[in-house]
């Protein structure tokens, strides 16, 4: 299993929207606040073309566009890890347009997302022998303060957290 390098201070976080983007409230405002927080923490941001797209049916853009964005941003040297903008329902339609061979040959990179993103967090390990994180999407990082699960997920990306156990209750 390939484990990606940790996100370093001052590194670049990439964002993709292979399912829903951040076009409606509360996701739009939460993603804006998350971006502000990451910049204050010293990180650079690399937003994919579908992050604010809403011309797809049940997803941010056409499946061809979503698959292309996911492939291009995963293999890009312009970002150090990827966080999905949101979950959703139809990411399964993107998979025919994701170049898993290209991704398998690229350096390992952390991918973080939940819900519909299971289509990628499951296939990265099984098809590309690369670890992925099933965890919060981009807008979740806009909450104040960060829930412990959000702190831990970011800690996995940075290498500060190696073990995650569980949480009392749920996020509010």
Where are these regions (language model features)?
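Short, acidic/small-residue loops that bind anionic groups at enzyme active sites
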Residues: 98-123, 131-138
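Conserved anion/nucleotide-ligand pocket segment
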Residues: 130-172
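Short amphipathic alpha-helical segments
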Residues: 27-28, 94-97, 124-126
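Short, surface-exposed connector motifs at secondary-structure boundaries
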Residues: 12, 77-80, 101-108
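Long, hydrophobic/aromatic-enriched structural stretches that serve as scaffold segments
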Residues: 67-68, 73-98
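Gly/Ser/Thr-rich loops at beta-strand to alpha-helix junctions
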Residues: 20-23, 86-91, 113-119
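ATP/NTP phosphate-donor binding region
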Residues: 1-78
């Amino acid at each position: 299993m390939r484990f990606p390098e940790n996100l370093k201070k001052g590194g670049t976080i990439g964002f993709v929207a292979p399912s829903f983007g951040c076009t409606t409230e509360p996701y739009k405002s939460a993603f804006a606040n998350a971006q502000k927080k990451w910049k204050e923490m010293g990180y650079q941001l690399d937003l994919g073309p579908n992050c604010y797209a809403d011309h797809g049916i049940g997803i941010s853009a056409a499946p061809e566009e979503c698959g292309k964005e996911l492939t291009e941003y995963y293999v890009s040297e312009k970002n150090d890890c990827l966080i999905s903008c949101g979950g959703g329902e139809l990411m399964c339609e993107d998979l025919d347009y994701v170049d898993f061979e290209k991704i398998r040959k690229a350096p390992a990179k952390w991918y973080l997302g939940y819900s519909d993103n299971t289509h990628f967090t499951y296939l990265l390990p099984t098809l590309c022998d690369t670890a992925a994180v099933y965890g919060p999407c981009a807008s979740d990082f806009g909450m104040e303060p960060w829930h412990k699960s959000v702190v831990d997920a970011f800690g996995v990306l940075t290498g500060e957290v190696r073990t995650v156990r569980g949480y009392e209750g749920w996020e509010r």
